[in-house]
Amino acid sequence: MSDVNASLVDGKKILVTGGAGFIGCAISERLAARASRYVVMDNLHPQIHANAVRPVALHEKAELVVADVTDAGAWDALLSDFQPEIIIHLAAETGTGQSLTEASRHALVNVVGTTRLTDAIVKHGIAVEHILLTSSRAVYGEGAWQKADGTIVYPGQRGRAQLEAAQWDFPGMTMLPSRADRTEPRPTSVYGATKLAQEHVLRAWSLATKTPLSILRLQNVYGPGQSLTNSYTGIVALFSRLAREKKVIPLYEDGNVTRDFVSIDDVADAIVATLAREPEALSLFDIGSGQATSILDMARIIAAHYGAPEPQVNGAFRDGDVRHAACDLSESLANLGWKPQWSLERGIGELQTWIAQELDRKN
């Protein structure tokens, strides 16, 4: 449980889109009891929710409205009866690889779902005090890299020819951790492009309507509560399932792809910390652990936990995947009154305990 001051949410009417998912359930534990009314709007999509039933992890005081953010009629039905003061916009399609073949679905939910929200706010004359959007590190794409002479460049998306030749890195350059105030967003996936469009829509709308907006660009979130059946998101859970079955964990490229893995508890606490600040016209922060970890190292931690075989590099790749991703937390640490508490080893151990409990509960 977060120990930050959440007085700015006490007694407020809060709406959370996509609030029955992984992150939504975690923040409901921190916020639902503090709100005067806490409403979750979620379509319980089968890719995330194997059964279209209320998640056990969703706080009992959360009112669940099963509806799609792209449905204008659903927005009318909800907001004719409920005028939220705080809106946490989590609803999104999040599959990087899947977005290449289902681009329309990602654009519909991530972009049109956001404009349906803003249209409904205007239509019903709601004076929102604060909107918080969870965005993604995917908006940065490959991000900024530094040459040996100190020059900073943006190499852009790795092409198919480069990947087929197993030229994984950009020679003579080092990746720089992303930071919102200095790293240009240049997405290399359809998913990342739709998340950046989502940011742009809300920025333009919120500045015009003088609605305070906070955007959190999340790194790779993992931990108890994430889907164990969705193969498009959450490689930590996917690798855990394989290792638990004593199967070999396959690693793309050369295994040295890096990611910033951040615990769900740290992410939920960051959201609460952001809401606990006096809202500004626009705030933009990176949320991660601040540490880059190779996929190989992460897989080895999981395999060792179960006594599974050594992970194996298979040389496969996915178009649109970035080589390295990590964030610089200096601005977030200085402004949010928050810092990550969970090491990767501790977080992975906690996830394995939860997975065992979930499987026992379902058997």
UniProtKB/Swiss-Prot annotation:
Optimum pH is 7.8-8.4. GO terms for molecular function: isomerase activity. Pathway: Bacterial outer membrane biogenesis; LPS O-antigen biosynthesis. Coiled coil: none annotated. Keywords: Isomerase, Lipopolysaccharide biosynthesis, NAD. It catalyses: dTDP-6-deoxy-beta-L-talose = dTDP-beta-L-rhamnose. The active site is at Y191 (proton acceptor). NAD(+) binds at residues 18-24, 68-69, 90-94, 191, 195. Its cofactor is NAD(+). GO terms for biological process: O antigen biosynthetic process. Its EC number is 5.1.3.25. Belongs to the NAD(P)-dependent epimerase/dehydratase family. This is dTDP-L-rhamnose 4-epimerase.
